[in-house]
Regions:
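N-terminal module-boundary/linker segments of secreted carbohydrate-active enzymes
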Residues: 20-52
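Sec-dependent signal peptide recognition
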Residues: 2-10
């Protein structure tokens, strides 16, 4: 048995949802996040610590406490799904609970293992303040550089011992204060900044059972690290932390005590942004009932940061359309480019994204609509089993959905995790550089009709484009009209069929989750869009005939890159470059620019002429046609090397 000791109570109050005290209990291995927050929150005695050059609070606990990491053990979807899995396989309850808590309640699970306990239970988790602290500070910062990146460390098999070493990215840390306050010794180790440390939980293989309920093997439940490994990103030095813990390239004091402490650069923010906006909103909306330890303002900030990631760093769309006068039809091509370092979407198989293509005539009447959705968030015209991958779409009830559909040992569709033996379909868009025979390809395979699509992750014989092209044929149109075409990428954390399968279980945890789910806005999140108007007469319509496009080359670059912007017509342009925190580095405005290609160069400096740090930046183009109040935008990711 291990002892819990109280150190200090830390809470934050704001209007609305109140941020409850972070736990300060301790054990042989761990200390709660409240103990870390004593020093790593923007507060006295040194109130100048943990703020950026604009005076913004960038403290670790302020960012972390409203993330899915902090709330991993509170997450109502996870708790409902665990109970449903146990109900389906009650003889494997101990296996399920121990496996799931290894990453959702790691302090409780790891401490129990250290104490000689073979299996950790949900009941124990609920009574353990450290377990309920989720993926807390003392977990990630104590993971040792042992077997990282190897199968031995995947699926929650990270190594933590009782040496009480806290690993960080900076050399020569000040040791005394941390030793005296929490009995941890800070030490520098580069592995804390590597993707491999994230892979310990975000590479998850789960056992699957056959019809007799016997464990018959294991299959990948989520493997974003392996997807990243089989991409261009490792060679570019772009780690998980680059996007999900973006760096502030400023001199920042990392602790509010001792008062004489110097600054460090950079600070990787503990925002842990991802694609789970839906569950963040649920945690915020029902925080009092769930017992979250963050305020409404905390959650709103994390939601905003997550939306910024989805909108700027997930996918880019382009669109072209041709009028076929012989058939009175439109031929439309929508290109999708994956901007992330893993598949899009990635991780848990409840997620999906789809293209919504809408064609309207000049009176605003919809003449074609693929990918429409209803009030429940379900896609209109979805096939009964599952929607296959499409290369060409000719009917409104055909829709391009990027998803992975699990199968059991009989090749039947399943949503039960312990029945997942593989996938019937996996056309999630791979990252740039992904090869069918590349590293870990057996665990990240493209499945289904996408393997036969010459435009999916391919350009002719070239593999690894990290994109897709979908062709639409819209017939039965009038030759005397103009048509407005819009394409939108919609994203959804929980597909309605996945949710409905869960709701079939009569369990208290499922009822709780369902009650929250049914009060949520179930609309998908639009994360990218592109539009075009085409005139069948050949006369330019009110909106552009071609699209706003941006290309960057070389990319990655050093010392200079060219930014080419294709303007659909005459107008005004604003070019802005942001870091991954959303901070504007430079802005260029040009008025009365002519239609066609415009070119700008960037040398990696900010508006003050100062050299920026190496890393990922986002170029955003905003364009307004002459005389039009409507702005169109295009984004592109730039990698600056040194």
């Amino acid at each position: 048995m291990h002892l819990f000791n109280k150190i200090i109570i830390l809470s934050v109050s704001v209007s609305g949802l109140i941020a409850q005290s972070l736990p300060t209990e301790t054990s042989t291995l761990f200390s709660g996040s409240g103990s870390c927050a004593v020093c790593h929150t923007q507060a006295g005695p040194n109130t100048a610590a943990l703020q950026d050059s604009h005076g913004k609070d960038v403290s670790q606990t302020t960012y972390w406490r409203s993330t899915m990491m902090a709330n991993a053990a509170i997450d109502p979807l996870w708790r409902a799904k665990v109970q449903a899995e146990i109900a389906s396989n009650p003889h494997l309850q101990s296996v399920i609970e121990d496996k799931c808590t290894s990453c959702h309640a790691p302090m409780g699970n790891t401490q129990a293992g250290y104490d000689g306990q073979s299996d950790y239970t949900i009941a124990e988790m609920l009574e353990n303040p450290l377990a309920m602290d989720g993926v807390s500070c003392a977990v990630c910062h104590q993971i040792q550089d042992q077997d990282l990146g190897e199968g031995e460390s995947f699926s929650g098999h990270f190594t933590i011992d009782d040496s009480r070493l806290i690993y960080g990215p900076f050399s020569n840390p000040v040791v005394g204060p941390m030793v005296s306050m929490v009995n941890y010794t800070p030490t520098m180790s580069p592995h804390i900044s590597s993707s491999e440390i994230c892979a310990t939980c975000h590479t998850l293989f789960t056992p699957y059972v056959n019809d007799a309920g016997e464990v018959a093997g294991e299959a990948p439940e989520q493997v974003p690290y392996l997807e990243w490994l089989n991409s261009d990103y490792p060679e570019l030095g772009i780690e998980c932390q680059t996007c999900h813990m973006p760096a502030i390239e400023e001199n920042i004091i990392l602790s509010n005590r001792p008062q004489w402490l110097g600054s460090r650069n950079p600070l990787h923010t503990h925002e842990f942004v991802g694609g789970n906006v839906f569950m963040l909103k649920m945690l915020r909306n029902f925080g009092d009932e769930l017992g979250v330890r963050a305020s409404e303002a905390h959650f709103d900030s994390t939601i905003d940061r997550s939306m910024r990631l989805l909108e700027r760093q997930s996918v880019r769309l382009n669109l072209s359309a041709v009028w076929n006068s012989m058939a009175d039809s439109l031929t439309i091509e929508v290109g999708v480019e994956n901007l992330s370092g893993h598949k899009f979407p990635t991780a848990y198989p409840s997620r999906r994204a789809w293209l919504e293509l809408k064609v309207e005539d000049q009176s605003g009447n919809i003449v074609f609509h693929s990918g429409a959705w209803d009030a429940t968030g379900e896609i209109v015209g979805l096939d009964p089993g599952y929607e296959p991958h499409h290369q060409t779409i000719t009917q409104q009830d055909q829709v391009q959905i990027y998803q992975n559909i699990p199968r059991d040992v009989n090749s039947d569709k399943t949503y039960t995790l312990l029945r997942i033996a593989g996938y019937l379909k996996d056309n999630r868009i791979p990252p740039a550089g992904y090869l069918s025979d590349g590293l870990a390809a057996d665990s990240t395979r493209i499945e289904g009709l996408a393997t036969q699509d010459p435009d999916f992750n391919r350009n002719g014989l070239e593999e690894g484009t990290g994109g897709d092209k979908v062709h639409y044929s819209v017939s039965g149109l009038s030759p005397d009209a103009s048509y407005y075409i819009s394409a939108t990428m919609n994203y959804q954390t929980i597909a309605p069929r996945f949710a409905q399968d869960l709701f079939d279980y009569d369990l208290p945890e499922v009822e709780v989750f369902q009650s929250y789910y049914e009060q949520m806005d179930l609309s998908p999140i639009p994360i990218a869009s592109v539009e075009q108007t085409i005139s069948t007469s050949g006369i330019k319509a009110h909106t552009p005939e071609s699209q706003l496009m941006v290309q960057v080359y070389p990319n990655p670059f050093n010392p200079e890159t060219n930014i080419q912007v294709s303007l659909p017509e005459d107008g005004n342009i604003k070019l802005s470059i942001f870091d991954l925190q959303g901070k504007q580095m430079i802005e260029i405005q040009r008025i009365n620019q002519s239609r066609g290609m415009q070119e700008y160069s960037w040398d990696g400096k900010d508006s003050q002429g100062l050299n920026l740090e190496a890393g990922i930046y986002v170029v955003q183009i905003e364009f307004r046609a002459t005389g039009s109040p409507i702005a169109s935008r295009a984004n592109s990711k730039i990698v600056y090397l040194k």
